[in-house]
Amino acid sequence: WRGVSTGFASGRISDITIHPENEHVWFVTAGSGGVWKTENAGVTWRPIFDNQSSYSIGNIALAPSNPSVVWVGTGEDVGGRHVGFGDGIYKSTDGGDSWKHMGLKNSEHISTIIIHPDNENIVWVAVQGPLWSKGGERGLYKTTDGGENWNKVLGDDEWVGVTDIVIDPRNPDVLYAATWQRHRTVAAYMGGGPGSGLHKSTDGGENWKALKNGIPSSNLGKIGLAISPQNPDIVYAAIELDRTKGGLFMSDDQGERWTKMSDMVSGGTGPHYYQELYASPHHFGRIYLMNVRTIVSDDHGKTYSNLPERNKHSDNHALAFRSNDPDYLLIGTDGGVYETFDHGNNWRYLDNLPLTQYYKIAVDDELPFYNLYGGTQDNGTHEGPSATDLSEGIRNADWKHILFADGHDTATEPGNANIVYGETQEGGLHRIDRKTGTVTFIQPQPLEGEDYERYNWDAPILVSPHKPTRLYFASHRVWKSEDRGDSWTPISGDLTRDQERISLPIMGRTQSWDNAWDVNAMSNYNTITSLGESPLQEGLLYVGTDDGIIQVSEDGGANWRKIEVGSIKGVPATAFVNDIRADLHDVNTVYAALDNHKYGDFSPYLIKSSNRGKSWQLISGDLPERHL
């Protein structure tokens, strides 16, 4: 394999750590790209976690008493729809050159690791636990023997995990922890509950008490913690309150009483995606809250503003400081790593970390070398050549950013490499003319009096193999265009279950409307997720949905035949139809890849039909769990 993607985009960073004894050595973790290490302040990098079984990372920590000891918690701690999951915690004793799995395999999402300042064998791990299902391993875990054994010291609820912990630098027996109750389903997201809150231990985590004086009694959401390095009696908490509102709370008496300083809270797609809180080691009272734009306060959160971020990617998740430079910040975003030497007035982008998260890719048929296209998480849609006959090879300048926002599915027109289709989230379909540079919005719109179109977060695009200008697109119904998207005709009714998603169970039961729903963090539900057409028979169409349905039409959409995936032996009724493909050689054969991990089921579901969907068989064979 050779890497072929762009050099102008990186990807989502989950954590950053600077070596305490050598500030040229950094460790960077990615939401979907493993762990990377540099020994020259970002000039070059090497991946140090690629041989392990998880690519999604939540947190990294170095032992203060022996920085060669490195701990990595897998599965990033955000509540988003596109979050990767992990398989526990890992330890290295040689600076990341080799790793050993140390347990917590069913944690899925690890948020914070704290190592005792004087004893590398004592470690506390904040485990948020599964996002999509109950149970698993969640809570605060402690080891006193370097990870050989773990003791759960906080948390006993099937939906409540621990999202952050901080330690008093004067007394390692004093710890503060934030619990978080959350659950996401394919249909909805609830980002808070009565299990969320603040807790304190004065005996190294063996016993805990809830901190409630001054904290609102409503259903809290995600909480970020920080402790003042200059005066550790001062503890800060960025708290998500009802319906994604929030506030910055401060205690000046070691957590006994709390005062709301302001309404400071992260926003954008929702606090579930940010809320990491940092206290400056250089300026007393200065705190940073990760957000779409980094929020900074110089008076303990009473007043605040956005850090200057000109020529820098938004969506900030991680921050690191140098011990001897108060104006230096190293920050991780959805677009990679940046550093500033003047507190945000100017930024340097480290463009050499290949971490871009591609949703889907496509190729055209241009000669002599075809081009590649890919839609990415928060880095737009990219175009670049597969090869070149130039002596200098493929350059960064050969890659183009052809569409904005989150890029998703892409498609090309056979025989005409100038026409490309791309989309932004939830069906923002565009046609790109590579020759003229024109970008045209062509999303199908409902007719007057019709309800809105429910487009999936990653809606499917299909160019017909029988007519290059014919385009299919899907919301909850299938649309067809004969003129590259200039006009559209619906060729189906609603092919999904069309449910009222707020009435569906979440956290194990039906919830009232006044609970901690985060509507803005929910994707559309009851949507079409995949489209296919037989290359051997025009109008033989296949549709898959996010609610466990396959639909087949043999007459170009005039009639549809419904298959419940739960009727297929060995397939759960809830399975998400992620991709459906008609066979290239046999007109009667079709394949589908299904996913049920959003119900806590990591089994592979690959199915095949040899009679146009009338009957199916499971063909997953010995494919391993967590891979399809």
Predicted segments, located by residue:
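Beta-propeller blade termini and top-face loops
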Residues: W1-L628
